[in-house]
Amino acid sequence: MKFTIYQESRIGKRASNQDRIAYCYSRDALLMVIADGMGGHLHGEVAAQIAVQFITQAFQREAQPLVADPVLFLSHVMTNAHHAILDYAFDKYLPEAPRTTVVACLIQNGQATTV
């Protein structure tokens, strides 16, 4: 699989940039993930980092070289990333869970699956 990646992140009006961007690939599949911590909420940048790391690590475990069921994979990995963020909040005794938006796209077999 051949591909070119270009990424750009802009801080906007906030004091810190909470964007996290990652991609990983196997011989036959490509995963791209974008997370943007929700400004105004506690630890949004941490939530974005946890989500990106969790999703990319799951892909690296599952893509052999393809993900067996892309829809199921993305559904499960998003739910599990959410639980990882909740676990972080619990472990750190935070008054509320950190928040982030996440978009993931898995490309394989000539098809893109997004969530």
Descriptions of predicted regions:
Residues 1-115:
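PP2C/PPM-type serine/threonine phosphatase catalytic domain
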